[in-house]
Amino acid sequence: VYHRFGPVVADGMTVTTRQFESHVKYLREGGYAVIPLRHLVDYHIGKRKALPSPCLAITVDDGHKSVYTDLFPLIKKYKIPVTLFLYPSAISNASYAMTWDQLREIQTSGLLDFQGHTYWHPNFKHERKKLSPRDYENFVEMQLKKSKEKLEKELGTKVDMLSWPFGIYDEELIRKAVEIGYVSAFTIERHHAKPSDPVMALPRYLITDADQGKAFEKVVRGSPCS
């Protein structure tokens, strides 16, 4: 999972466009198939019989404006599918985020899938401590449901995959997400996805600009999706 992009490393979550391009080239040269995340989920739940091996999926969380300015040109150049996990409260509101029009524009490429990251990216552990059990339950429902509804309304896409903010999840959150209509969800637990992994807590590697050369090789080495 990536977050932000740019010509230089602006913060701990920024990967330079040069570094991202080197990642894509490494994958190409190594024979890795970059597949839509949906294919991985469908395989995991038995709706798809096979995947290319080795393969992986690329995801980007949050909806930072650098996805539009810096990442999208590379997505088009290399024709790679990417899943964006968005929290709608920021879109067209926060100065760091993309706009709905920008999302619709890049959507026409057919290379991007838009999925949910809650409504405003809360820390569920903190909210649980602050709120009464009833208020917390209502808060969770709002975060999961409102995000799904807003994304589907604005982008006309089916939203049934979820990225847990800060990688925080538990059985109660999973139960509520399934109730609302999510069929899979993703963490930031650093290991390769296995058939035995729970579909509502599938792992992902958090990628930073430090993941270059041998470090990036360690992330992807020996990662067949079957």
For the regions a protein language model found, what residue spans apply to each?
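A cross-kingdom marker for long, charged
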Residues: 191, 195-218
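Short, electropositive alpha-helical surface patch
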Residues: 168-184
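N-terminal pre-catalytic segment of deacetylase/amide-hydrolase enzymes
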Residues: 1-56, 211-213, 219-226
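Metal-dependent polysaccharide deacetylase catalytic core of the NodB/CE4 family, i.e.
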Residues: 3-7, 47, 53-56, 64-66, ...
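Short phosphate-binding/catalytic loops that engage adenosine nucleotides
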Residues: 32, 80, 182
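Acidic, His- and aromatic-enriched active-site or binding-groove loops in soluble protein domains
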Residues: 109, 182-191
